[in-house]
Amino acid sequence: VVAVKTSEFEPGDITAFYYNNKLLVRRVICTGGSQITVEKDGSVLIDEQPLDEPYLTEKSIGQCDLEFPYYVQPGNVFVMGDARAVSMDSRLTENGVIPTDRILGKVLFVN
């Protein structure tokens, strides 16, 4: 994984971070200070506006135990994997949102 260190993230950015000593690559869906809703069909709303996700081939609610709408606190990001049906990500309270200071950077390349 090649990543550029930064503290500024936007929806759509691909990030790398460690979770339980394992390197994970996930996409930022919602940044701190915003509210996210994931509908039953997998559609995502940020502050009640539909999120355009042209990178997805299939939408899915996947594994999720959060109640929506969910407010993302400043200094955190809500991440999801592109393989929504099977991704372990911020939709699970076990994983939760990711503090931006734990993110290694924006991913440029994955080998």
Task: State the predicted function of each range.
Residues 46, 63-107:
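Acidic/glycine-rich C-terminal interaction modules and beta/coil loop segments
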